[in-house]
Swiss-Prot record:
Signal peptide range in chain numbering: none
Lineage of producing organism: Archaea, Methanobacteriati, Methanobacteriota, Thermococci, Thermococcales
UniProt keyword list: Carbohydrate metabolism, Hydrolase, Repeat
Induction / repression: Expression is induced by diacetylchitobiose (GlcNAc2) but not by chitobiose or maltose.
Keyword Oxidoreductase included in the entry's annotation: no
EC number: 3.5.99.6
PROSITE patterns: SIS
Summary of temperature dependence: Optimum temperature is 95-100 degrees Celsius.
NCBIfam families with a match to the protein in the record: glucosaP_deam_GlmD
Catalytic reaction(s) noted: alpha-D-glucosamine 6-phosphate + H2O = beta-D-fructose 6-phosphate + NH4(+)
Protein name: Glucosamine-6-phosphate deaminase
Top-level EC class: hydrolase
Length: 326
């Protein structure tokens, strides 16, 4: 078994690891997250910073997310405001831009990482979630980091935290779709893929796009669900797979599905309710902030099996390294 597939399958275990890391943090520190937070990261870590910023805003604070390089060199173009905390995210804790980003704002610094590292040592606070992935690409650590920090957000804002055992079991159930995903990639040799998501699922669509590029070296795009109708849909035809990430679909999702099918594309809907798609993966209804956790292992499996279909080794993605440094 490839290390990448093994790491995807560790998602349920990663949720439990995340819960232990959260509990250890709150036991050893009385720190509470403030209301105004800037999140930053690179690549997958940036796409992780986006749902964390959205969750902060949804829970009553104000979250802003931007890539480390933009925070370092172009932040005057972003609504950074007057944050009370900077959260820098890096799986290794050694990513050059993530470490340098800690110095970009004169506010308390927080590291979200998997290791005792340069990042954690330079930060004022560190939430270390020891996922210690073997895979080059970020897989279950994305989900674990998100869950651990979501727990900290809830606790800091005086809200009830999520049931880690239940969440872990839900990801285990999601992973049971592996065989169906393998069937889809075997049956339909799509030549491009478009990922769609709204709200907190939009950055998950972006992460899905990146996973497809990293693992399968494959052309993929991502858009806000209904924004795709405004020009972008022109690239979809009989060789296209459209992956619709939804929580609870409504009539617009069904209309969009038919629109793409009318262009010859096939649609895979992932969520709590079918849209009349060619393929459908049914997920249970959960709190909206938990939906990324259920979608992530599925889109990772889709990218993995597309890579296998193309005869590639997902453990050795071209031109990529586990830690990115200048």
């Amino acid at each position: 078994m490839h290390a990448t597939l093994r790491e995807i399958k560790r998602t349920p275990e990663g949720i439990k690891t995340a819960q232990r890391a959260f509990e250890e943090f709150v036991t050893n520190s009385d720190f509470l997250l403030p209301r105004e937070v800037v999140y930053t990261g690179c690549g997958s870590s940036h796409f992780l910073s986006q749902p964390l910023a959205m969750a902060t805003t949804r829970l009553g604070g104000r979250g802003v997310a931007l890539p480390c390089s933009e925070l370092l060199y172009s932040r005057e173009y972003y609504p950074v405001g007057k944050p009370e905390l900077l959260v820098s995210i890096s799986r290794s804790g050694e990513t050059t831009e993530a470490v340098k980003a800690l110095e970009s704002l004169d506010v308390p610094k927080f590291a979200l990482t998997a290791y005792e590292s340069t990042l954690s040592r330079k930060a004022d606070y560190a939430l270390i979630v020891p996922t210690h992935e073997e895979s080059v690409v970020m897989t279950h650590s994305f989900t674990a980091f998100y869950f651990a920090f979501l727990q900290l957000l809830n606790a800091s804002f005086g809200l009830e935290t999520y049931d880690a055992e239940m969440t872990s079991e839900l990801t285990r159930e999601a992973l049971k779709n592996e065989g169906y995903i393998r069937e889809i990639t075997g049956e339909f040799d799509f030549r491009n893929v478009i990922f769609l998501g709204s709200g907190i699922l939009y950055p998950i669509a972006l992460e899905a796009m990146l996973k497809m590029k990293e693992m399968a070296l494959f052309w993929s795009e991502a858009y806000q669900t209904f924004e795709v109708r405004h020009g972008f849909k022109s690239v979809a035809d009989e060789g296209t797979l459209v992956v619709l990430l939804v929580n609870e679909p409504f009539d617009w999702h069904e209309k969009l599905t038919k629109e793409f099918q009318g262009q010859g594309a096939r649609v895979l809907t992932i969520g709590n309710g079918d849209t009349g798609a060619d393929y459908f993966i049914d997920l249970p209804k959960v709190d909206e902030l938990l939906t990324p956790i259920l979608h992530l292992p599925i889109i990772q499996l889709l990218s993995y099996y597309k890579a296998i279909k193309r005869g590639l080794n997902p453990d050795q993605p071209r031109f990529l390294s586990k830690v990115v440094k200048w």
